[in-house]
Amino acid sequence: MARITGVDDGKEEMVLDLRVKPSMRKGWNGNFEAGYGNDDHYRAKGMANRFKNKMNLSINGTANDNGINSNQRIGANYSQNTQKLKYGGSIEVRENKRDSWSKRHTESFLSDNTSQFSLQNNQSDGKTSAISANFRFEWKLDSLTTIMYRPTFNFSKGNSNSGNFSETLNNESTPINRKEATNHQTNDRFSTNGSLQLNRKLNSKGRNIALRLYYDLDDGNSDRYSLSNTYY
């Protein structure tokens, strides 16, 4: 804000200003790393940068699978400056998958010299996907008038499932009770917000007039289904 109006608003920010020779502001650079292991487990990450005059483009991503969780992410940043217009933004897409299961066998010894056996199986899986983006635009209409617009967007959706089975047997392997339970859940959410500002310098002494507009929208849904049965 202080840069636009010329008036100190008290909100100081530490900025690291790196300047590169014009002859060096072009070309590509980047790196990539990857690894692969047993049971199709993997891990990879990479990035690439593009420079051309006053245009910057950066793309980066990661992916991994450790057997229980798998994650993928890719993002991009872009900026471009011209005499009248400065614009840019970033976007990121993410996905997470998880899958786990467990088995448990126990034996309990009772006071009447008998025992009980318990069997338990648990399984769960789920998936979450999300995308987020933010942009910035700055128009310099003339030497005194500037318009700035900064919107952001976020969207996510997911689902999860879980199941549980347990059974208790006596020492003669006769069932005493059995329990079964399942759960299913889905959700999605969308949100956006932004600001629009019009600034006009009145004179060279720091007097300005500004009009600011803000908006915010958030909407989401969630559904859950559960079923549990016990048998004796």
Where are the language model's segments positioned?
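Conserved catalytic core of Hanks-type protein kinase domains
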Residues: 51
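Primarily recognizes Gram-negative and organellar outer-membrane beta-barrels
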Residues: 2-44, 54-232
